[in-house]
Amino acid sequence: MAKEEIKIIAQNKKAYHDYFIEETYEAGIVLSGTEVKSIRMGKVNLKDSFARVENNEVYLYNMHISPYEKGNIFNKDPLRTRKLLLNRHEINKLIGYVTRKGYTLIPTKLYLKRGLVKVELAVARGKKLYDKREDIARRDAKRELEKHFKEKQLGI
């Protein structure tokens, strides 16, 4: 089979900095027509968004989709709550994760797959300040090592 084409529209890079990502799920999302047009134009922000399980359904909060310029009366509230579409067994697994202390649901990517808008939902555990510092130190050390090898390879 041919590889499915995925066009990434938005990424939540802050999530990788603030959380340990345990597992990811692909979820559909319920949107209006003007929201889809706005997303296709890339006018979406995942930075402070999160998901919750309520009444055995998953909802996404604080995802900002800018109003479509030509949408006038059909535009919805940019920060409205949006329902995510997942299978029942996936929702049950998410409920199991979220009931444990310290775990939360964070959207990490928003992308188009076969013309449909999908959200990559991650089960995440918050990092402490020392974990963040450790990651930064590790990243800097790796960067220095790569720089050293590159200089050595070029003969500088």
UniProtKB/Swiss-Prot annotation:
It is found in: Cytoplasm. GO terms for molecular function: RNA binding. Keywords: Cytoplasm, RNA-binding. It holds the Pfam family SmpB. It comes from the Bacteria. Its main location: cytoplasm. The keyword Disulfide bond does not apply. This is SsrA-binding protein.
